Amino acid sequence: TNPPTGWGSLTDSKWRGKIAFADPAVSGSSYTILCTMLQALTGDNASILTEFAENLDGKPLSGSGDVVRAVGEGRKYIGVTLEETALKGIAAGYDIEIVYPEEGTSALPDGAAIVSGCAHRENAELFIDFLLSSDVQTLLHDSLYRRSICESGANAGTDELKLIDYDLEW
């Protein structure tokens, strides 16, 4: 059987019981993944969610790390999780590969901010500069498998990915 190529494939009944996915009620990443799926696909959202849920056989996993383990240990064929989680699994020795959905995926930023009127603004600005430095961005990539936000950073950007216009207010 050909592996799935996109979000739409995950609603095909041939994958019933073969998909690992963390419970979106307790996993923020799984919630974001579901929102991405629904925004990338056209059709009735209730039907898409129902078909996907049926393919999970009523057994969502307790966390994102469980998704990679289920696939890496051969208990499931497909794992739907974040890129960084999959990369950590590959680094840990699991024989898995990443497939990016043909319909597109999301790339959401993490944030760092300075509180308005804070007592030590100069130190806060220095800390933000430190976080955005090439050294820290390289460390985040090499150790935590996060994409760099710096064009000069390791694995910079998302140019090779097909990204959807993710609606944060959706």
Predicted segments with their positions:
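Periplasmic-binding protein-like
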Residues: 17-26, 49-53, 60-61, 92-118, 130-153, 160-162
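Short, hydrophobic alpha-helical packing/hinge segments within bilobed ligand-binding/sensory domains
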Residues: 67-68, 86, 124, 136
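A bilobed periplasmic-binding-protein/Venus flytrap-type ligand-binding module shared by bacterial periplasmic
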Residues: 1, 38, 108-121, 139-140
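Extracytoplasmic ligand-binding site segments that recognize negatively charged/polar headgroups
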Residues: 1-75
